[in-house]
Amino acid sequence: MGSFSIWHWLIVLVIVMLVFGTKKLRNIGQDLGGAVKGFKDGMKDGEDKGAQPAASKELRDSTTIDVDAKEKSRQQ
């Protein structure tokens, strides 16, 4: 009573196929498969980029901007 037999699952499958149709189920399966593949590729790309050491960037003094700070007065 607690678990479903193979016959229960077959009946559910037939009802789902009658309600949605095989073409709609196939499209849903393709969309889901594409999403899973994209997720796996994204995870693999993230691991590859994380494994490479970060290239050190050289900062030059000419990129420094010299400005005078202004005081702000608080109005209440």
Curated annotation (Swiss-Prot):
Biological process, per Gene Ontology: protein transport by the Tat complex
MF terms from GO for this chain are:
protein transmembrane transporter activity
The annotated topology with respect to the bilayer is:
Single-pass membrane protein
Q: Which UniProt keywords apply?
A: Cell inner membrane, Cell membrane, Membrane, Protein transport, Translocation, Transmembrane, Transmembrane helix, Transport
Spans through the membrane: 1-21
Instruction: Show the ranges annotated as biased composition (Basic and acidic residues).
Output: 41-50, 57-76
Name the NCBIfam families for this protein.
PRK02958.1, tatAE
Q: What is this protein called?
A: Sec-independent protein translocase protein TatA
Q: Which species?
A: Cupriavidus taiwanensis (strain DSM 17343 / BCRC 17206 / CCUG 44338 / CIP 107171 / LMG 19424 / R1)
Encoding gene (name): tatA
